[in-house]
């Protein structure tokens, strides 16, 4: 009998062998010959997905779980390149940026301050509109997941350790804020995973709610935190027993598949029971820490029809659940449970929780599509009052409690929304805050939607109620300065940019560019919504082509991922965050390409730095940034048709002076080392508008990089 060669085996047999190989062995095997290096083997999705999730504890993403190339690239770069960015309202230091000097926002939580008169203040930044890296992350190791709570940002490391910044409950008086990542603690006797591995405390999956965090450990324990400074409580139930994972399969009754911390409830998907809901538990602040390490939850409610398991024969599921199907994913909203099943259907159930009743109503199917359409749902995501439903053809539906779920249970449900920018654009996940939300797309970029309360920066698009935000498509309204995106932004979305150089570029151009007087009339036209929408779209195309503009043909890394590649996005309340892979080598090259070559200066004088230094000393010691932003304030007033402020003061820079903004002391034209940016001679764009109107000016018309979009009939309100 002849020996069987490895390559003689059917590919299905090879797939059964792969899970027993570590990554080094798998790569070595698939590199031995051409036959094994074929994409369907070398980039086998189940292998790389499992490797990434088991090694780094990265949460599964159902929409791309079969994308082997993505999982392979993620595995390679997670080792060295993951960064945590946050933005939005920094109440209780929930962004993790610490205390530093910054230019204050013209809008405070209480109303409008003097436009543009932003003085440097040393305190925690109240509003952050541009993504900024969290501080103190490097010492934690590899970050696998991050989630925002109502007043916190929480991180999971590849070792299974949880850390948080801010406070769990911003309405409680006894919770001091944590400005830097602090470990979430366990009862006495259990180590934090940063100390040593212990299955009972190493976290496999976690969820951040409004004011509490739920986590599922490797051993199958459910842990609940309601205070940054106090140990967790283990959750146990009176009505059923949970299974410790050791020596038990995932089909064993009592096995916990997932936990979700909702707006005001906790929930878990448990084999044999279904989706179980309970009131979040809290540790008594006055009780000694050593007295209590677990809580027996007396009152629970089970979502009907959610106990069916295709691979389980050890118990008899309820008859209704067989038709509903096996739960694939679920979310816990303010008043509802929403879940999708393996049959491609989505169901909702109302949570009834009062003194008379603790129950979850019978489920109702959420209709997808229109008459004649058949949609197969693959995932549900959401929080608080908003949700999204994904289908296998790339359709993404969005909805909320008031407009949709209330109608489903009371009268007639209005059709779910389909935002144009989310359809067939490879959306992986959607993260919802109170009034804003973000979409993560498979190519690694994030788009923003909704409203930015009090110009808090939650959309991550830049600006604080000023032209920098307006040029990204934000219209500021009311006394509090709420920012709402123009309708045009729903066609392709507005991307979040991580490069600081783009912020400099935006600041320079929105201040009039090289000749503010020449651009004055064009800038004033932005008060009209359609003009603002078109100009913001032009800037969107230019900013999205940043690597093409400044990186040549070598801006993609060897695995074709972008310089900034977002792995996940999260949002809650008025703030947001993202876990991003950053290729520092590529980022530095692009950063350098944004700068002009140093200019040879006359003898005894460096080209621009010495001149700037002399002018600083003569300007009443006001400081570089103060004078730059005073000038920006004059631009804002001028843009709005208001009188200039402090026209006699030493810091006043006349916008009519075309040379004012190429001076290195003014923001956006020159880098800290004195070198000018390549856009320091650019003008504010001049466009031919969709209605046939030509923007006034003396400069050449600006060309559309990707062509002017057709908004008519595709975007509501245009």
Model-predicted regions and their roles:
Residues 371-373, 410-431, 460-567:
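Conserved blade-ending motifs and adjacent loop-strand segments that build the rim/top face
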Residues 50-91, 97, 112-122, 132, ...:
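F-box-proximal linker/hinge
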Residues 85-134, 158-182:
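Beta-propeller domains
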Residues 86, 152-155, 164, 212-215, ...:
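Conserved core positions of repeat-based scaffolds
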Residues 91-92, 150-152, 167-170, 210-212, ...:
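Consensus positions within tandem repeat domains that build extended binding/scaffold surfaces
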Residues 201, 206-353:
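Solenoidal tandem-repeat scaffolds enriched in leucines and small polar residues
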């Amino acid at each position: 009998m002849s020996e069987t060669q490895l390559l003689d085996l059917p590919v299905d047999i090879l797939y059964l062998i792969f899970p027993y190989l570590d990554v080094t062995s798998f790569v070595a095997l698939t590199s031995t010959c051409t036959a094994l290096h074929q994409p369907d083997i070398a980039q086998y999705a189940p292998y790389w997905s499992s490797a990434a999730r088991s090694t780094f504890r990265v949460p599964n993403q159902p929409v791309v779980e079969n994308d082997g190339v993505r999982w392979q690239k993620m595995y390679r770069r997670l080792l060295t390149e993951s960064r945590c960015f946050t933005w939005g309202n920094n109440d209780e230091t929930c962004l993790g940026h610490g205390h530093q000097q910054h230019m204050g926002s013209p809008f405070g939580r209480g109303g409008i301050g003097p436009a543009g008169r932003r003085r440097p203040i040393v305190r925690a930044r109240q509003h952050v509109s541009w993504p900024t890296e969290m501080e103190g992350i490097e010492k934690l190791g590899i970050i696998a997941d991050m989630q925002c709570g109502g007043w916190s940002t929480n991180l999971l490391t590849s070792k299974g350790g949880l850390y948080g910044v801010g406070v769990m409950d911003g309405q409680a008086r006894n919770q001091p804020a944590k400005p830097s990542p602090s470990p979430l603690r366990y009862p006495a006797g259990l180590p934090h995973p940063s100390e040593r591995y212990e299955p009972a405390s190493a976290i496999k999956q976690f969820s951040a709610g409004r004011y509490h965090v739920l986590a599922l450990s490797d051993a199958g324990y459910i842990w609940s935190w309601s205070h940054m400074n106090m140990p967790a409580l283990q959750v146990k139930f009176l009505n059923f027993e949970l299974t410790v994972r050791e020596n038990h399969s995932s089909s064993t009754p009592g096995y916990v598949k997932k936990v979700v911390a909702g707006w005001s409830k906790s929930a878990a998907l448990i084999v044999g029971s279904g989706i179980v809901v309970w009131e979040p538990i809290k540790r008594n602040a006055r009780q000694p820490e050593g007295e209590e390490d677990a809580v027996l939850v007396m009152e629970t409610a089970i979502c009907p029809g959610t106990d069916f398991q295709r691979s389980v024969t050890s118990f008899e599921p309820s008859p209704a659940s067989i038709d509903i199907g096996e739960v694939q994913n679920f979310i816990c909203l303010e008043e509802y449970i929403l879940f999708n099943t393996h049959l491609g259907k989505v169901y909702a159930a109302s949570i009834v929780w009062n003194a008379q009743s603790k129950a979850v109503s019978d489920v109702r199917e959420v209709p997808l599509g229109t008459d004649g359409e058949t949609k197969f749902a693959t995932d549900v995501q959401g929080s608080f009052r908003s949700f999204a439903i994904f289908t296998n053809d790339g359709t993404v539906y969005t909805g909320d409690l008031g407009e949709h779920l209330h109608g489903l249970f009371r009268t007639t449900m209005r059709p779910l929304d389909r935002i144009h920018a989310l359809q067939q654009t490879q959306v992986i996940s959607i993260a919802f805050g109170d009034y804003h939300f973000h979409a993560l797309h498979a190519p690694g970029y994030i788009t923003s939607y909704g409203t930015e309360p009090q110009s808090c920066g939650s959309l991550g698009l830049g600006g604080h109620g000023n032209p920098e935000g307006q040029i990204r498509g934000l219209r500021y309204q009311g006394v509090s300065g709420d920012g709402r995106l123009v309708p045009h932004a729903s066609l392709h979305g507005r991307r979040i940019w991580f490069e600081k150089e783009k912020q400099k570029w935006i600041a320079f151009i929105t201040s009039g560019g090289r000749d503010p007087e020449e651009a004055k009339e064009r800038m004033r036209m932005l008060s009209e919504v359609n003009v603002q929408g078109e100009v913001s779209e032009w800037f969107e195309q230019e900013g999205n082509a940043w690597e093409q503009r400044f990186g040549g043909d070598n801006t993609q890394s060897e695995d074709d991922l972008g310089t900034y590649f977002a792995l996940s996005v999260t949002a809650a309340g008025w703030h947001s965050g993202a876990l991003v892979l950053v290729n520092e080598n590529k980022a530095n090259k692009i950063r350098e390409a944004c700068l002009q070559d140093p200019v040879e200066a006359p003898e005894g004088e460096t080209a621009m730095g010495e001149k700037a230094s002399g002018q600083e000393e003569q300007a009443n010691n006001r400081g570089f940034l103060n004078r730059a932003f005073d000038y920006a304030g004059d631009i804002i007033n001028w843009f709005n048709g208001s009188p200039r402020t402090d026209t006699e003061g030493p810091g006043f820079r006349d916008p009519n002076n075309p040379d004012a903004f190429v001076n290195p002391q003014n923001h956006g034209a020159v880098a800290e080392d004195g070198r000018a940016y390549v856009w320091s001679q650019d003008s504010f764009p001049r466009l031919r508008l969709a209605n046939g109107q030509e923007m006034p000016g003396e400069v050449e018309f600006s060309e559309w990089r990707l062509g002017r979009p057709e908004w008519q009939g595709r975007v509501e309100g245009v």
